[in-house]
């Protein structure tokens, strides 16, 4: 039975089709306060879109808190950070409040955006990150993520010398 389950999961776990240079799929999702955000509204500035499985779970909390701690550096660079999961705006509100998360969390409850980015998993979104440039093109895709160091890895890619900050 376990082998069958693994096979079914692998069958539905398709890789990421989007690559650097591709146009990032536009989306309109609601944040924790009920405000709609469209990716196209942020053209002209770089955007980090990170998909994560679930609010207030150990790995997702570590990842969100790392982004939280580095948020001043993202702001300094003019980079907008969006975390996306299938959780409801209410769940996002609790998660943000509990961990003092300063950036926007978006609700993809119908999995449409995760599917368009190739980040949809069978039950939860895959942990994957896209860096989108000022023109709306994907500049980097992270399919393998270390929750504790991922934020710094992105800052390094964006040109911040994070080793000087520790």
Indicate residue ranges for each PLM-predicted region.
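A short beta-strand-turn-helix
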Residues: 28-47
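Conserved redox-active cysteine motifs that mediate thiol-disulfide chemistry
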Residues: 51-69, 73
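Short, internal strand/loop/helix patches
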Residues: 82, 93-128
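Short, small/polar residue-rich loop motifs at catalytic or cofactor-binding pockets
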Residues: 23, 46, 124-126
């Amino acid at each position: 039975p376990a082998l069958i389950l693994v096979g079914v999961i692998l069958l539905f776990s398709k890789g990421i089709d989007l690559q650097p240079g591709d146009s990032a799929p536009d989306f309109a999702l609601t944040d924790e306060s009920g405000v709609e955000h469209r990716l196209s509204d942020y053209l002209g500035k770089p955007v980090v879109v990170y998909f994560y499985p679930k609010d207030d779970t150990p790995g997702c909390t570590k990842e969100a808190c790392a982004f939280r701690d580095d948020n001043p550096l993202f702001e300094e660079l003019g980079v907008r950070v969006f975390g996306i999961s299938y959780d409801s705006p209410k769940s996002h509100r609790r998660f943000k409040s509990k961990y003092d998360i300063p950036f926007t969390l978006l609700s993809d409850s119908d999995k449409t955006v995760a599917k368009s980015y190739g980040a949809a998993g069978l039950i939860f979104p895959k942990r994957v990150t896209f860096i989108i440039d000022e023109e709306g093109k994907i500049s980097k895709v992270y399919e393998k993520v270390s929750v504790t160091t991922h934020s710094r890895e992105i800052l390094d890619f964006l040109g911040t010398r994070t080793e000087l900050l520790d």
